[in-house]
Regions:
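Bacterial N-terminal signal peptides that target proteins for export
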Residues: 6, 61, 69-84
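Acidic, glycine-centered low-complexity repeats within long intrinsically disordered regions
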Residues: 15, 21, 26, 32, ...
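Long, compositionally biased low-complexity repeat segments characteristic
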Residues: 2-31, 38, 53, 164-181, ...
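Residue-level detector of bioactive/disordered segments in secreted/extracellular proteins
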Residues: 12, 63, 89, 99-101
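N-terminal ligand-binding lobe of clamshell/alpha-beta domains
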Residues: 97-181, 187-266, 270-523
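Bacterial N-terminal signal peptides
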Residues: 80-95
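Intrinsically disordered, low-complexity regulatory regions of eukaryotic signaling and scaffold proteins
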Residues: 19-20, 33, 42, 269-278
């Protein structure tokens, strides 16, 4: 043999070469066979003496295929070898095809346009919906990914395909069994939960089977929203029940209603008069008290067999302890970290997808319409009165930043806010002296508090004598909202139009046609 060139050679015009497109270098060995570089135009020649399973081969690929020499001890070997390679090629092709399907499933999708929410990305794919929740504490990264798949056999097939694409050779059935056992859902093998999946930026990814029909809800605003969406029967467990001013939930808990008849009627009135909500209807299924949201009763949660947990995330929380190991989808309700009132309200669309509430889009559309109409109305009024919010808590006075949701609400009400020039989107931790110095000339002082008897000016001075330096205190222009009696948080979290109306009334007392205050009352 002459000089052997170091190059790659294709399997010529043989059928096997066309099927595979594989390259074999001069140093390649396939089943102990070495390919020489002395190929003829008619095909590929194998060098002699190469031993394959103890047999010498001197064959040439031609139009007629593979020919054995007389020295071959097993005349059927070439056919066997060809079939073996063909089987290998077909296996690779099928695997490649399957991977292609999985890749295409993720690559192809339609992104739903969201007008206000900055922390949500929703992409509709064939057979599933991908939802990425942005990390509000680490801009540009994903906090949690959700893969929403409808329940049923077809959904199971989609879940298996996506899991194989993410986890490679993971035993999907075994993962499903482990998930079922961790939930205590005997005999239930529904593919849902984390199952070891990871999303963008290494975040947790959960498969959520929709509609969610059973959930543990850790916050009162989301309980109220589910009632408005007609999904109240999906609430099977709650945390911090004593703070939930929803009469029907207290009944389903088997407790005396925490919300008085006054608060219940004011809640219903707020929603119906806004034109964007509907009165809550009662549900028949009982609700379990799962303890504190900071230390939930894990055993009670397991006993519920919930399909999801709705939890508000916190910065540097370090995860959710034992809840992380239950393999139950944890819906991190980061809506409260949106920096615009309508941005938080637009999360209604996400919750509508989770619970398959057909009214979600129309509910948000009504909220948006009412909010923008009120904003336009306020813009036509003269600049409003100046407003100071909240009060001293210990040694700190927390005030909304100028770019926060509350700061934007005050701006849209055309009110004068003493920290309007601030660039923060969260709360400002200020000393009482700083606030008094900045806001001594404010016209209106409006704050919230929880529990106890209605406050008086004398009680406020006992709390902090510096309040008397405020002009609003001196003139008696003080407004309070007792959130132990008034369903403030349950209502306004996803209904910013109601709170906007309140602030327009407070800062523009001369405005007509806005009705009476629903949450704040003059001290």
């Amino acid at each position: 043999m002459n000089n052997v060139l170091e190059k790659d050679i294709y399997l010529g015009s043989s059928a096997l070469g066309q099927a595979t497109g594989m390259k074999f270098s001069d140093s390649d060995r396939v089943s102990g066979m070495k390919f020489s570089d002395s190929d003829k135009a008619s095909g590929l020649k194998k060098s002699v003496p190469n031993v394959v399973f103890g047999m010498k081969i001197s064959a040439a690929y031609g139009a007629g295929g593979l020919k054995s020499s007389a020295a071959s001890k097993h005349s059927g070997f070439p056919l066997f070898f060809g079939l073996l390679v063909l089987w290998f090629v077909l296996s690779l092709s099928l695997s490649s095809c399957q991977c292609g399907k999985q890749s295409a499933a993720w690559d192809e999708g339609d992104t739903i346009r969201l007008k206000y929410a900055q922390l949500l990305t929703i992409v509709e794919h064939e057979g599933f919906t991908e939802v990425n929740v942005g990390n509000p504490w680490k801009k540009g990264t994903v906090l949690h990914q959700y893969i929403l798949i409808k329940k049923g056999k077809k959904g199971d097939e989609t879940a298996e395909m996506l899991m194989k694409g993410r986890n490679g050779s993971q035993d999907v059935a075994g993962a499903s069994q482990a998930m079922a056992e961790s939930q205590g859902a005997a005999g239930s093998h529904t593919l849902a939960g984390s199952l070891g999946l990871t999303g963008p930026d290494g975040c947790r990814a959960d498969i959520v089977r929709t509609p969610i029909c059973s959930s543990a809800v850790f916050t009162s605003p989301h309980c109220q929203l589910l009632y408005e969406l007609g999904c109240q029967n999906a609430i099977r467990g709650v945390c911090d029940s004593k703070y939930i001013l929803i009469e029907d939930i207290q009944k389903r808990l088997g407790k005396p209603a925490a919300a008085s008849s006054e608060s219940g009627s004011r809640q219903s009135s707020a929603l119906s008069e806004s034109g964007s909500g509907k009165s809550s209807t009662s549900a028949s299924l009982p609700i379990a008290d799962c303890g504190s949201s900071m230390q939930p009763d894990v055993e009670k949660i397991i006993a519920l067999h919930p399909e999801a947990l709705l939890i508000s995330p916190f910065e540097n929380s370090g995860g959710y302890g034992k809840l992380d190991n239950l393999n139950i989808p944890i819906i991190e309700a980061a809506d409260y970290m949106e920096t615009s009132p309508l941005g938080r309200a637009e999360w209604i669309k996400f919750y509508g997808l989770l619970f398959e509430a057909n009214t979600a889009d129309s509910l948000f559309a009504a909220i948006e319409k009412e909010y923008l109409a009120l904003k336009t109305q306020a813009a036509k009024l003269p600049k409003g009165l100046s407003i100071l919010t909240e009060r001293k808590m210990g040694s700190v006075w927390y005030s909304p930043g100028g770019k926060s949701t509350m700061g934007i609400l005050l701006k849209d009400a055309n009110a004068r806010y003493i920290f309007a020039d601030d660039e923060h989107s969260g709360s400002l931790s200020l000393s009482p002296e700083q606030v008094i110095a900045r806001g001594s000339e404010v016209d209106v002082w409006a704050f919230k508090y929880f529990g106890g008897q209605p406050l008086s000016r004398a009680a406020l001075l006992q709390e902090y004598d510096g309040y008397k330096a405020l002009r609003a205190f001196q003139t008696g222009n003080i407004y309070e909202c007792n959130t132990d009696r008034i369903p403030y948080f349950e209502t306004v979290s996803f209904h910013p139009e109601i709170l906007l109306r309140e602030f327009i009334i407070l800062s523009h007392p001369q405005a007509k046609g806005l009705g009476a205050l629903r949450f704040y009352r003059k001290m």
